[in-house]
A protein has these predicted regions:
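Active-site-proximal segments of metallohydrolase catalytic domains
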Residues: 263-339
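Fold-level signature of zinc-dependent metallopeptidase catalytic domains
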Residues: 197-255, 268-278
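Active-site recognition of the HExxH zinc-binding catalytic motif
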Residues: 353-370
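Bacterial Sec-dependent N-terminal signal peptides
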Residues: 1-3, 7-8, 15, 25-70
Length: 481
């Protein structure tokens, strides 16, 4: 990229000196003549013009993106803590607290674009012009809880934390929550003045100790991941670092992460717990840990999460992070992943590696679960609405998903291959199509491939559709095409 930027001015900058003009003319002619072949001089000239135009366009896009960020934001983070409250009938959003953190580790290009819709969006507008200057999408445990029967009879409140670049001038922040029909169910707009004396400054002192596990090739255009210790005591930190390396290598054993490894910057944050392990309410076990994680989320035995997002971000304040992977010191099976919130996984169960990668598929790329629970139906995806997840479809708008990857002769819906589920099954004849079940539903929701990391722990890789979705996400965050 830097070579292209340097070559631009030498070819395109005008000079008043005739000698320099003649030299530039010779350079251009030599460049043109380098494109050997039977093309005419005019064709070669046109080809060279197109090449130069592409270089100019690329440089312009990079420059405009950088100017946009520098015009509206400083190199710092505005952390906004919210409380989401309500039940199945009504929901509300309230601002809890504002914090300022040194440095900004999120995107600096494509600021107003969303790579996926998510179950909600945070939108930042310049207060004076009302121009959208930053957007991001997310999902939350609160919205998931609304789909359970408990939400029909009780009201609850959930913590949520969002990070946006710190503004230079006053901004309006809008938070929208969507239901499973992709309709807005709650919204809040509030104003933030960057000079507000009640914005708490954190992350400047007493930063949680951390180790850098991998440094990106370009730290200005990379994806920052922080592994966070949960349920590790002071004496167990060496075990945590080993677990981080295991999780990291498991992720980079999967394409497209493997091919794009240099775009990731990874640290291990040593959040120390008073007690080892995690809480297991189903067994009457409660532990005093850094993030207060627990099994039995929403009364599901293996659903391991934390509801204490403010504590999580307090531990992370001052460390280089955007995407969060919480590693829990337990040998019991469990985990969870929420888009642009966090990924949480047990570490000492035999399925640790596939689970931590699977959950990162949720939290990083917005991928949906491609399985169903036997005969149990969880009405997460209405069959008359196209899901926003890139690897799920109800066929309502299949063309917006992976229809372009399905061969013309492949039937849609697609029957399961006879070898699916068999040990050492040959996958050479497997094809991209639309397979049931998926999205916790036996019928009406479809996945792209017979098996995938988003479906089972046994499958060793992401399917072609998920790989494409992850590639697009990595390119989005690192501003690559």
């Amino acid at each position: 990229m830097s070579l292209l930027i340097r070559s631009g001015p030498s070819l395109l900058t005008r000079t008043t000196k005739k000698t320099n003009t003649r030299q530039q003319s010779l350079v251009v002619r030599r460049k043109i003549r380098y494109f050997v072949g039977k093309k005419s001089y005019q064709e070669k000239t046109e080809q060279m013009k197109k090449t130069i135009s592409l270089v100019i366009a690329l440089i312009s896009c990079l420059t405009i993106g950088a100017q946009e960020f520098q015009h509206y934001f400083t190199d710092a983070t505005l952390r906004i803590d919210y409380t989401f409250t309500g039940n199945a009938k009504s929901q509300a959003i309230a601002v809890d607290e504002l914090c300022k953190i040194p440095r900004w580790y999120g995107k600096r290009q494509r600021l107003a674009e969303l790579p996926v819709e998510g179950n909600g969006q945070i939108t930042v507008r310049d207060h004076r012009s009302q121009r959208v200057i930053y957007r991001n999408s997310f999902s939350t445990l609160f919205q998931e809880w609304l789909s359970y029967d408990e939400a029909k009879t009780s009201t609850k409140a959930f913590q949520n934390v969002f990070l946006v670049p710190y503004p230079k001038d006053t901004i309006d922040v809008t938070l929208d929550l969507k239901n499973n029909r992709r309709q807005t169910m709650a919204t809040l707009t509030h104003t933030v003045a960057p000079a507000d004396i009640l914005i708490r400054r954190i992350g400047e002192k007493a930063v949680t100790p951390y180790e850098t596990l991998q440094q990106a090739a370009d730290t200005t255009r990379c994806i920052h991941i922080a592994y966070v210790a949960e349920g590790y005591t002071e004496s167990e930190m060496p075990v945590f670092i080993d677990d981080c390396r295991t999780a990291m290598e498991a992720l980079f054993a999967h394409e497209p992460f493997k091919s794009m490894r240099s775009r990731f910057n990874i640290v291990a944050v040593k959040a120390t717990s008073e007690e080892s392990g995690t809480s297991e309410p189903g067994r009457g076990i409660w532990k005093n840990t850094a993030l207060h994680s627990n099994f039995n989320t929403f009364y599901s035995d293996r659903y391991l999460t934390t509801l204490h997002l403010k504590d999580l971000h307090d531990w992370l304040a001052g460390t280089p992070y955007e995407h969060i992977i919480v590693l829990v010191n337990t040998n019991n099976y469990g985990g969870g992943g929420i888009l642009n919130s966090y990924n949480l996984s047990m570490t000492h169960h035999p399925a640790f590696k596939p689970v931590v990668v699977h959950e990162f598929g949720h939290s990083f790329a917005g991928l949906g679960d491609e399985y169903a629970y036997g005969k149990e139906e969880i009405p997460m995806y209405p069959h008359d609405i196209e899901p926003w997840e890139p690897n799920l479809t109800t066929l309502v708008d299949f063309n917006s998903k992976w229809a372009d990857m399905v061969k013309e002769k492949t039937p849609v819906p697609t029957p399961q291959p006879a070898t699916l589920g068999q040990p050492n099954a040959k996958k050479t004849h497997w094809e991209t199509g639309a397979y049931e079940p998926a999205g916790y539903s036996q019928h009406g929701v479809y996945r792209p491939y017979p098996d995938c990391r988003m479906r089972t722990n046994e499958n060793p890789e992401f399917c072609p559709v998920c790989q494409r979705a992850i590639t697009r996400m990595i390119n989005f965050y690192t501003d690559k095409q």
